[in-house]
């Protein structure tokens, strides 16, 4: 069933509920006890749309009295549960993407694959994290900048649970999912993500492409392909890794997004040494933020391994000094 058909069906159910409850709640634009608008009893519902009608109907529950509240529980609550749109394989990805873009942040929550998602405000900035660390560096690579220290975060955890504007996927060139964080993101977002990725026709190393986040708390997924390093990385591979981050940030600006979380790109099975990768990442993010700090709220370095967390805690003060 298409998304349009699903929503049309929900509206039909809501209209039926409205006919039952119309005597219990004033219509929009009608004072309590005033005459009902002429014409179809459900005419105003069409103009309100599904979410507008939901808000209007819910707002009036307290004014209905015991009888009205009882009718609401028996009739409206089951219909509200039924109004959840299915983001399974039966839905076209284009329709699902359009539908999700029209929702508020609160409305999107019912479509998340998880309930224990992490809001941006719960992720400490580097300025906050560094307070509890011995992070003084004698000769940092860059000057102290309090504003930049509030724009960068180090977070250890599951990137798929972050409620940010975008998360970055360390993808392979096919963009169709794989191992590691790539597979985790595809499983959490659902099959519609793979459906959209099929239309992107691969991605070159160092480049990035963007899709909807679907069932993820993140609104978008930025897919980038890192270099495969065998042994010590070459200058060309370092440039490609840097390009992964900068290309992703270009898309962030292009789509007017303000928060993004990066995984460790090219480390692990792609063979890029963790320490060398961290140097490339931190230099790239620092230099980019110096140019665009007013256009973003947060850049998050999201690590999964304790080893990577230790590397970034040790290297961050060299690029984002706090003392």
Curated annotation (Swiss-Prot):
GO terms for biological process: DNA damage response; peptidyl-glutamate ADP-deribosylation; protein de-ADP-ribosylation; purine nucleoside metabolic process. There is a cross-link at residue 136 (Glycyl lysine isopeptide (Lys-Gly) (interchain with G-Cter in SUMO2)). Its EC number is 3.1.1.106, 3.2.2.-. It is found in: Nucleus. This is ADP-ribose glycohydrolase MACROD1. It is an enzyme of class 3 (hydrolase). The modification N6-acetyllysine is found at residue 161. One of its GO terms (molecular function) is hydrolase activity, acting on glycosyl bonds. Substrate binds at residues 157-159, 170-172, 177-182, 265-271, 304. GO terms for cellular component: mitochondrion; nucleoplasm; nucleus. Subject to competitive inhibition by the product ADP-ribose. PANTHER family: ADP-RIBOSE GLYCOHYDROLASE MACROD1, GANGLIOSIDE INDUCED DIFFERENTIATION ASSOCIATED PROTEIN 2-RELATED. Its main location: nucleus. The modification N6-succinyllysine is found at residues 94, 101, 127. Residues 139-320 form the Macro domain. Interacts with ESR1; Interacts in a manner that is estrogen independent but is enhanced by estrogen. Interacts (via macro domain) with AR. Belongs to the MacroD-type family. MacroD1/2-like subfamily. Keywords: Acetylation, DNA damage, Hydrolase, Isopeptide bond, Nucleus, Ubl conjugation.
């Amino acid at each position: 069933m298409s998304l349009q058909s699903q929503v049309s069906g929900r509206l039909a159910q809501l209209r039926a509920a409205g006919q039952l409850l119309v005597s219990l709640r004033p219509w929009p634009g009608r004072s309590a006890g005033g005459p009902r608008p002429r014409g179809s009893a459900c005419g105003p519902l069409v103009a309100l749309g599904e979410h507008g009608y939901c808000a209007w109907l819910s707002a009036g529950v307290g004014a209905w009295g015991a009888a009205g509240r009882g009718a609401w529980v028996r009739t409206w609550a089951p219909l509200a549960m039924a109004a959840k749109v299915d983001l399974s394989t039966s839905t076209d990805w284009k329709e699902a993407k359009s539908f999700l873009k029209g929702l508020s942040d609160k409305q999107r929550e019912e479509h998340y694959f998880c309930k224990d998602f992490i809001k941006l405000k719960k992720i400490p900035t580097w300025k906050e994290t560094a307070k509890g660390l011995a992070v003084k560096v004698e000769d940092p690579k860059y000057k102290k900048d309090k504003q930049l220290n509030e724009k960068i975060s180090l977070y250890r955890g599951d990137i798929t649970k972050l409620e940010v504007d975008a998360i970055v996927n360390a993808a392979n060139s096919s963009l169709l999912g794989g191992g590691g964080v790539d597979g985790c993101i595809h499983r959490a977002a659902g099959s519609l993500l793979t459906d959209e990725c099929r239309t992107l026709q691969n991605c070159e190393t160092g480049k990035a492409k963007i899709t909807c986040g679907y069932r993820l708390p993140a609104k978008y997924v930025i897919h980038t392909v890192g270099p495969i390093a065998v042994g010590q990385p070459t200058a060309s591979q370092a440039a490609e890794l840097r390009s992964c981050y900068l290309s992703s940030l270009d898309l962030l600006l292009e789509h007017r997004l303000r928060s993004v979380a990066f995984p460790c790109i090219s480390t692990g099975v792609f063979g890029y040494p963790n320490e060398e990768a961290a140097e490339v990442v931190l230099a790239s993010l620092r230099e980019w933020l110096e140019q665009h700090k007013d256009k973003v709220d947060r850049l998050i370095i999201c690590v999964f391994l304790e080893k990577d967390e230790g590397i970034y805690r040790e290297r961050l003060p060299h690029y984002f000094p706090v003392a």
